Every structure is written in structure tokens, then in C-alpha cells.
Amino acid sequence: MVAFTSLLAGFAAIAGVLSAPTESSVEVEKRQTIGPGTGYSNGYYYSYWNDGHAGVTYTNGGGGSFTVNWSNSGNFVGGKGWQPGTKNKVINFSGSYNPNGNSYLSIYGWSRNPLIEYYIVENFGTYNPSTGATKLGEVTSDGSVYDIYRTQRVNQPSIIGTATFYQYWSVRRNHRSSGSVNTANHFNAWASHGLTLGTMDYQIVAVEGYFSSGSASITVS
């Protein structure tokens, strides 16, 4: 996609279905290739969604590990983390991330009251999610400057159903596929620009793609 607004439309479709509550939460085996759903895998919460296009294989591994392989995938997003998340967690992630096309590696989650969808983007493929957005500020954390943005979604799917809500973004300038993210640094920086979070819902390290191909193998802790 060539515009931030069109990207967000794709994100809304992805994130809305990703975040919608399901009844598929189950404790899965140590390593298992799964279909779309949410649940727990070796002590970590996972969430995986795709739009039904062929070519995506999501596999939960041991501990906080997961792998994704995709080709001409349509929309998908999947990853592992915590339910609920916290506002001061230091999230460690490591592994490989090899996108060809439009794809993202990010800390992703939601809060309630206010209803907020948020991203801390660590790496991306050919499309920069800040394209066309209004920059509110920046924060230096974990070895890089991140640019801060806010966008709004109107009557879009969310963790409470169709709603109007804001999205908060930190986009890292120096891409990486391994490291630590001090989420408090981002949340505090957002708050200094009036971007406050409510009660935390889930918080995961997510790989997502939009009509692209690639592979990722990530471990979260």
C-alpha cells in the first residue's frame, strides 16, 4: 500500500479480528502448528489471525517462541506475549525476521477505558507505517529514536466490538529483530503528549504481513 490511511484500513481489519474475543483458548502442546485463534502455549498468551488466504503457517514453539512462514499471504498477524499486559514491562525478543514486502514486527496491544490500540514498531519491510501521519514527538529508548504518532479509527472492530478509538504508535528509526523494549519509556512519552492508556488488555510481540512473503522465528520473554 502507498498511503498510511490505506495501511490503517488493513490494520483495522487485522487488529479487529485479532482482538475479538474467542472461545478457542486452550493450552497447546510444546510445539504445534495451529489455525487462527487465541490461547496459551507453554505459559505465554498467543493470538493468531489470517484472512483466509493460503500460504501462512504459524507455529507455537517451546516457551515464548513462535515461527511464521508466509507467501502471497493476504492479511495475517500472530505472536506471543501476555494477557493482560502491563505498563512497565521490559519485553525481550530475539530471532530472525525476513520480510519481502509489507510486514511489521512490533509490540502490539490494547487498553480499555480509554479504548486504545497501540504499536511499538521495531522493524518493518517495504512500507513505513509513519507515511502520511502527523508526528507528535519522539522518544529515545533502547538505542534508537522512535517517532510518535496518533491516528483514529471510526466505527472499526475492536476488543469490545465495533467502536471509535485512537491508535498510538512508536516507530523505531534503527530497525532490529532482537533486543529489549522498555514499554514504560514509550507509555510515559505518549502520556507527555496527552496519549494516555487505560486498563491493560493483551500485549504481544507480533509479526504481521499484508500481501507479502517472508519468514520469522521469534522468542519472547
From Swiss-Prot:
GO terms for molecular function: endo-1,4-beta-xylanase activity. Residues 1-19 form the signal peptide. It is found in: Secreted. It catalyses: Endohydrolysis of (1->4)-beta-D-xylosidic linkages in xylans. Residues 32-221 form the GH11 domain. It comes from the Eukaryota. Glycans are attached at residues 69, 92. SUPFAM superfamilies: Concanavalin A-like lectins/glucanases. Its EC number is 3.2.1.8. The active site is at 117 (nucleophile), 208 (proton donor). Optimum temperature is 50 degrees Celsius. GO terms for biological process: xylan catabolic process. Optimum pH is 5.1. Pathway: Glycan degradation; xylan degradation. Belongs to the glycosyl hydrolase 11 (cellulase G) family. Endo-1,4-beta-xylanase involved in the hydrolysis of xylan, a major structural heterogeneous polysaccharide found in plant biomass representing the second most abundant polysaccharide in the biosphere, after cellulose. This is Endo-1,4-beta-xylanase 2. It comes from Trichoderma harzianum.
